[in-house]
Structure formats: structure tokens, C-alpha cells
A protein has these predicted regions:
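A short, polar/proline- and glycine-enriched secondary-structure boundary/capping micro-motif
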Residues: 16, 27-29, 75
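Domain-level recognition of nuclease-like catalytic cores that cleave nucleotide substrates
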Residues: 40, 44-75
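Generic hydrophobic, helix-prone segments enriched in Leu/Val/Ile
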Residues: 9-10, 28, 37, 62
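Conserved catalytic cores of phosphodiester-cleaving nucleases, focusing on short active-site segments
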Residues: 6-21, 35
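Mg2+/Mn2+-dependent nuclease catalytic core
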Residues: 21-38
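Generic "edge-of-domain/loop-turn" microfeature
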Residues: 13-15, 24, 42, 60
Length: 75
């Protein structure tokens, strides 16, 4: 169902990034959800961060970002 732009895994966390250019961070987060990029971590005990990031082609910088955290840990 598509490809995630970047995943970073550490012993305690999983970071799922979706990048947009001249879009919105909300649009990027929506894509993570709609495409099911976090699905393979549904039973993972680490905290999962979904991060939507938008780059502005006009300024060459990040102009918007949003994150959402979830945890499947029982502790």
C-alpha cells in the first residue's frame, strides 16, 4: 500500500516519518494512517511516533511538522 519515507528504530522507540514538499504536516500524518505504515508495529512494545513533516520549496526549510505517539506497552 505504498512506501513510507523513513523509519528509524531504536530499542525503545519507532519513528515513522512522512515528508511532503509544499503540502502540509496534517496531510503527511493522514497518509501514514491511510497507507497503514505503522501496521507492522501494532504488536510492538515500543512507543511509536508518527511524524508528518512539510518542506517549503520557497524557503528551503521545514515549515510545518506534527507528531502523534502511541504505545502498545502493557507496562
Amino acid at each position: 500500500e505504498g512506501r513510507v519515507d523513513c523509519i528509524v528504530e531504536t530499542p525503545m522507540f519507532v519513528y515513522i516519518f512522512e515528508f511532503k514538499r509544499d503540502g502540509s504536516a496534517s496531510e503527511a500524518l493522514k497518509q501514514i494512517e491511510e497507507k497503514g505504515y505503522a501496521r507492522e508495529y501494532a504488536t510492538d512494545n515500543r512507543t511509536i511516533y508518527q511524524i508528518g513533516c512539510n518542506f517549503s520549496s520557497k524557503t528551503g526549510t521545514i515549515d510545518d511538522w506534527k507528531s502523534k505517539a502511541s504505545s502498545n506497552s502493557l507496562t
